[in-house]
């Protein structure tokens, strides 16, 4: 940008902009935030605001755009949502008192990972992640600036780092080391993350655990440094860092969580249709965030799981108390967000009133829990500190109808401060005095229309029309002349006005000062407020689980020390809820101690995938402390769940369906243990028939011989069912069907043994394929099943058109029938039939 011959104000802008080249600089000028040069051009397009110019008559006018300061947040939100950073430069002194250029400084840099204020606040976490590297070790730290949560872990490879970032749904990553080209490609382009660099470490280590590994320490320290560098203030609400290991929880990678629809529906990207949607009967924002966290990280500690189950049972046993509890929770605001606003110095009167309302609800919540007289609730009750002194302070100080803007006045209650009350008394009396003066002068002058008005320029004045100017008293002095009237003052009116203006100014200043003192006092309670928030959130989640257990007819699962699975009449709770009035068909899942693999066969659309997801969903629900959809359930505690359900190319990274299949299979067999759960659905369909079948069999054998994990393996390769005779720990199950009068009904019921048919042609019929095509396919399938019986020969090819449909019409005997006769078509599946048809078509 050209900087020659700039005005002092523009030179100031340029100097500040140099310090923040990667951010839009919002430069406060009076009632607007202005943007200049490229920032103005780009912002005008993104925000759809007018682009003008400064010094329009100059040879090189400076592009300029601006937004009103009072509505700037909505524009900032748009920029942040699109992945930009925004630096806020404020006026640091009153322009009226400034000598020369008004002093301006950047007071905050807002980035996608550091959003605290928003015009559209929601209850989701916004995690900012930092990663550092030392040799082959990675440190990953993350925090939520709203809640103050702060965590760190160590990871052994970059794939795990990416998986954790995906799970957190982070938008910004702070890098403590130089990425390789491949790593930057993955983070920036494939994962669409905003990348920021921080090479300095934060010096104040009171939030850090000095027992952390070096790379965990540096990741945490650089994250703190970045946050303090961008926010430029004390962040007293940040909690001490908590170290965790992925293996401390039920491990599930991003693909697994997506395929199981845990927190959002994979197809719609929305909450509805997910486990989170099913379980969310929370009443508070803190509870909603905590529930999402529990779903992301189910437990593997049986004692902690049982502790949650016992509280759910207590709530189930106390229906009326639980109803009262639910009503009380509705009066609780987002304490964590309010605490962060206090820490950031952005609290307004509305925030404090919401905090007081919340604190006033706590004694009732605590009394309800104490009234249940259950020892298992003691740890929750201990966290419910109502902080009565804080509630009393806010209630006594803040007026119930206080405006949101601090400087609007009317914030502090009458009676809270004696001096403030005196100023307000002067203002009230001054108003009465003015009314008395108006009446007196109207009577003395005989001007019936005489009245006193006010504006900022002239203050209080007598308004006299031109027709009455001859009756103006001698002690009136002229203040302004208008077209049809004049404005006058008197010494008495000026004296009262002076008293009122002084009282108004002193009142406003004192009220602001009192509010600042109260806000500072509230800041002393941040840690206690965060403890309270955690307690309320936990109560809220557990009551939510109780409500869902009751309304969805769930039961308490039992955990054994063995690997046996015995789920009687289990259901997929989300599918059942989505189906609504339709009847869901329950299925029993039984895998004995010595059974590690169920080979699941059956037609497409018959329910194989739902059956598999049902087991995984039940395990997740059980291990997060929820009750489960079944008549009874006995489960082991799994350490990890691996899935390959559904097929899709990874278009972003250019990987085919088969490559994605193999990568996910490799992830499972590389990391699974005997305590894991593996779900593979139609593995191998992304490649040629025999390649796929060979790989599927070898993977089954590897799991059987080397891992021993509980595994559901759904396949269209019917030949694999013969493995039951050679693999001791494998059993066949299938989805039952009913054939009657040429019609096929899928019963969605799992039964022992292999499927005898795949009914692919029936599925094709449901899909709406042409009748003549289906008839021809049925004849070919019959021929293949009969081994050696001549199939109806195709018609003689006479044109390019007939070549396209030759497999479906009569024709002279074709040599290709010899190839058909050589095929091993015993129990051949429809998918294999389609593969054969493709090969035959290519040879015709």
Swiss-Prot record:
Pfam families: MutS_I, MutS_II, MutS_III, MutS_IV, MutS_V. This protein is involved in the repair of mismatches in DNA. It is possible that it carries out the mismatch recognition step. This protein has a weak ATPase activity. Belongs to the DNA mismatch repair MutS family. GO terms for biological process: mismatch repair. InterPro entries: DNA_mismatch_repair_MutS, DNA_mismatch_repair_MutS-lik_N, DNA_mismatch_repair_MutS/MSH, DNA_mismatch_repair_MutS_C, DNA_mismatch_repair_MutS_clamp, DNA_mismatch_repair_MutS_core, DNA_mismatch_repair_MutS_N, DNA_mismatch_repair_MutS_sf. HAMAP family: MutS. One of its GO terms (molecular function) is damaged DNA binding. It comes from the Bacteria. Keywords: ATP-binding, DNA damage, DNA repair, DNA-binding, Nucleotide-binding. This is DNA mismatch repair protein MutS. One of its GO terms (cellular component) is cytosol. ATP binds at residues 602-609. The gene is mutS. It comes from Streptococcus pneumoniae (strain Hungary19A-6).
